[in-house]
Swiss-Prot record:
Domain of life the protein comes from: Eukaryota
Any Pfam family the entry gives: LIP
UniProt keyword Hydrolase present: yes
GO biological process, one term: cellular response to starvation
Catalytic activity, EC: 3.1.1.3
Molecular functions per Gene Ontology: lipase activity; triacylglycerol lipase activity
Subcellular location: Secreted
Disulfides per UniProt: 110-281, 359-404
Stated name of the protein: Lipase 5
Length: 463
């Protein structure tokens, strides 16, 4: 099916002048003296070189821009990120949705600022598909801001880099009025699923100390398939059809921590392994590593296996980038978590631990909507209506829960007061997924190797 679709759309792409990839685009390079700018400053800007994509046709919006923003890495070293600002038709300049995509790759040319452009590489399908989640935000009249939160080194799974980038992107958006017409006192809600929840969650947790001035702008954060322990996700997916997530994660960590890379490289006979880890976007990474065991079993790539975590340097990297371990970092803004009980990719146990950590620390408003009937893949769709309802309520000024509330429902489609138009929009997407024949039980993340090869077609059907 995927090959047939690619054949059919090839003539469309043949006539395109493709957007320049970040690795070859000088716009992504920091200007001289950039380190003297304050974090969140706009260093340069431009209209997106190509239209924002709605799949294989440009999205109907009012305008879109890219901002080059001063940020910093995990160690406080100055760097730059690009953030994409999308203005819908009939936009409300007082409302911003900061949407963090699940890029999940250690390759610069997978960045959302590139992937969201019409004509971007087919390996960025997954990010293009997330426009299905962003579109309802635009329909509400919200500006959508989507940062390249992994930064110039593509540091997938790295917490501080990601969270700081999200906050600096928001700072820049609030300063962009002369370019975008966004008000400097605009209200902001953050949203992310899976890898995007990692970035959004770290942003929410870091905000009180890193960007306290945003406290008056931020209305809350919605975190779905919430990643708080990168090791747990690696253990859940290693050796499975989703093992490519482990490869991409190892590449992302290695991009930020050279010593991490050196230690693991010395633990394998496959000396080119890290050269491959940063060569894939999410979908082609998953396809390339189906069933590969990196740290598990008798035929693992890294000889020490999971005992590598006993190395103090490796253990510290893992702990420093797991939000579940950062008990001192507690959001001051309202937070909404939604997660599937039977998630086999991001096990819910560490999400529950993080929820409890924040509750024990006295968080003012934390709502946890647990979905009993969906795993990671399908909760991205079935949980979205609840997240959107919560986001709309924040912009409408409705009351949040007081303290902590954890409710398990059979499905998060049962969340109160979901608009019927939003529910039907996502039910249609779910019907498409369930009829693709991805495996024994896609709602439980049970996907076959053959099913993985069909995943590329999901984006085609959605968009």
């Amino acid at each position: 099916m995927l090959y047939l679709i690619l054949f059919l759309i090839a003539p469309i792409y043949a006539g395109l002048i493709f957007p320049t990839k970040p690795s070859s685009d000088p716009f992504y390079n920091p200007p001289k003296g950039f380190e003297n700018a304050a974090v969140g400053d706009i260093l340069q800007s431009r209209a997106t070189p190509k239209s924002i994509t709605g799949g294989f046709t440009p999205l109907k919006i009012q305008n879109s821009w890219q901002l080059l923003v001063r940020s910093e890495d995990s160690f406080g070293n100055p760097n730059v990120i690009v953030t994409t600002v999308i203005e819908p038709v009939n936009a409300d300049p007082s409302k911003i949705a900061s949407y963090q995509v699940f890029e999940d790759a250690a390759k610069a040319d997978c960045a959302p600022s590139y992937a969201l452009q019409f004509g971007s590489d087919l390996t960025t399908f997954v990010t293009q598909a997330e426009m299905y989640l962003m579109a309802p935000l635009l329909d509400q009249g919200y500006y959508v801001v989507s940062p390249d939160y992994e930064g110039p080194k593509s540091t997938f799974t790295i917490g501080k880099q990601s969270g700081q980038a999200v906050l600096n992107s928001i700072r820049a958006a609030l300063k962009s009025g002369k370019i975008t017409n966004i008000k400097d006192d605009a209200k902001v809600v953050m949203w992310g699923y899976s890898g995007g929840s990692l970035a959004s969650g770290w942003a929410a947790a870091l905000q009180p100390s890193y960007a306290p001035e945003l406290g008056g702008n931020l209305l809350g954060a919605a975190l779905g398939g919430f990643v708080t322990n990168i090791t747990a996700t690696a253990q859940a997916t290693d050796g499975t059809v989703f093992a490519g997530i482990v490869a991409n994660a190892l590449g992302g960590v290695a991009n930020e921590y050279p010593e991490f890379k050196s230690i693991l490289q010395s633990d394998t006979d496959k000396k080119s392994v890290f050269d491959e880890f940063d060569g894939h976007c999410l979908i082609d990474g998953v396809l390339n590593y189906i069933g590969t065991s990196f740290l598990t079993g008798d035929h693992k790539i890294f000889k020490t296996g999971w005992d590598i975590l006993k190395n103090p340097k490796i253990g510290k990297v893992v702990e420093d980038n797991g939000l579940v371990y950062q008990k001192q970092l507690v959001p001051k803004i309202p937070v909404f978590i939604y997660h599937g009980s039977i998630d086999q990719i991001v096990p819910i146990v560490d999400t529950k631990k993080t929820y409890q950590n924040w509750c024990d620390a006295g968080i003012s408003s934390l709502e946890f909507a647990e979905d009993a009937s969906n795993g990671h893949l399908t909760e991205a769709i079935m949980g979205a209506p609840a997240a959107l309802t919560w986001i709309i309520d924040r912009f409408d000024g409705k009351q949040t829960v007081s303290g902590c509330q954890h409710i398990q429902r059979f499905s998060n489609l049962e969340y109160p007061n979901i608009p019927s138009s939003i529910a039907n929009y996502f039910k249609a997407a779910m019907d498409v997924v369930l009829h693709l024949g991805l495996g024994p039980d896609v709602q439980k993340d049970q996907v076959s190797p053959e099913g993985i090869k069909k995943l590329g077609s999901i984006e085609m059907r959605w968009l």
